[in-house]
């Protein structure tokens, strides 16, 4: 399906709500997204073996995780309007998300040969309290994907004598091996379940392609660090992440933009 027809048929994407509950020792987070008319998605995140905690203090972090999760579903239709009912955003936050879509989705726009999109964001009135986590330890959360970057980070932290907590999303065999070799006895494991309806839309010819996964990992790592009491998050990103690799419609496309220093700085400022 082409962009013009998709946007005409599906003019509005809605981040309706999120929910979270303790299931055994795990935290189960669900998001409710809708696309008018007739499409809905309910992706799920499961954070395993969490400590005893009060869920209310994590509302803002979970709400923001839903915003980055939302992009994977919005891209199917590129609806020109995104309505945020689950919470509220100020002007600076709206600018952050529009910029993330514009730069972080550059490879997606290029792959699909469509114009750059900057959707209008309509925000709700629900105010989420900004929580200061004062009781964090001085530990370091290290996301592990199984590649050389995370292995380098773990080795550097080990040599520096730093306390490290390994963290992995849908860990592969390589990731599990890396954590074992690094001596991570009890890593934080997170399972992300994509709504199968999105995969069905992909098969039907809706828009599909690159999303800024490292930005997703940044928001998820922040939540995991807060839950498990880690003060810092350490990532190794190659220097080439700061460089674009192709020109498209007058803009430089960087398919690794969410690994760049520019994104890291914007993310730090956003989190403040």
Model-derived regions: residue spans:
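RNA-binding accessory domains that recognize and position tRNA/RNA substrates
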Residues: 1-139, 151, 156-197, 201, ...
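ATP-dependent adenylate-handling ligase core
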Residues: 50-52, 169-272
């Amino acid at each position: 399906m082409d962009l013009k027809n998709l946007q005409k048929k599906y003019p509005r994407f809605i981040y309706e709500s999120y929910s979270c509950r303790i299931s055994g020792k795990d935290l189960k987070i669900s998001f409710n997204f809708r696309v008018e008319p007739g499409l809905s998605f309910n992706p799920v995140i499961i954070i395993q073996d969490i400590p005893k905690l009060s869920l209310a203090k994590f509302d803002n972090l979970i709400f923001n995780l839903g915003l980055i999760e939302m992009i994977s579903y919005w891209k199917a239709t590129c609806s020109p309007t995104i309505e945020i009912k689950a919470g509220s955003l100020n002007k600076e936050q709206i600018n952050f998300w529009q910029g993330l879509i514009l730069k972080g989705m550059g490879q997606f726009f290029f792959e699909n040969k469509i114009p750059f999109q900057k959707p209008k964001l309509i925000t709700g009135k629900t105010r989420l309290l900004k929580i200061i986590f004062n009781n964090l330890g001085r530990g370091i959360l290290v996301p592990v994907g199984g590649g050389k970057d995370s292995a380098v980070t773990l080795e550097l932290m080990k040599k520096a004598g730093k306390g490290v907590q390994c963290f992995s999303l849908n860990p592969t065999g390589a990731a599990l091996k890396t954590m074992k070799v690094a001596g991570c006895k009890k890593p934080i494991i997170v399972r992300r379940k994509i709504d199968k309806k999105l995969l069905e839309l992909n098969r039907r010819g809706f828009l599909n392609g690159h999303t800024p996964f490292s930005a997703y990992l940044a928001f998820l790592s922040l939540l995991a660090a807060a839950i498990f009491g880690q003060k810092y998050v350490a990532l190794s990103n190659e220097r080439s992440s700061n460089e674009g690799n192709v020109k498209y419609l007058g803009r430089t496309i960087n398919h690794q933009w969410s690994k760049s220093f520019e994104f890291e700085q914007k993310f730090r400022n956003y989190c403040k």
